[in-house]
Amino acid sequence: MWGIIATWRMAVEGISEASHILQEKGDAGDAIETAIKAVEDFPYYKSVGYGGLPNEEMEVELDAAYMDGNTLSIGAVAAIKDFANPVSIARRLSKENFSWRRG
């Protein structure tokens, strides 16, 4: 059995895509990454992702974290620039020894 919820309207499309992955017995990590990337990629959301508000130097800096519930491994990034989907980097880092990156 699986479940996935969204608490903000901006996540509905991503949750729908993730639900399809889970219904087809896909990987939960893939489903979560898909859901988050859908939000990160939408330019009209000003609090997160591609459309995020810039810092005082007028640069958009993004943060993300990922945790694998089976292994409890984590990955995180902070203040990265020029990359559309920080959740993908965080997920990849969860598989490495050094799981935290800044900038």
What name fits each language-model region?
Residues 1-103:
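Alpha/propeptide regions of enzymes that mature by internal proteolysis
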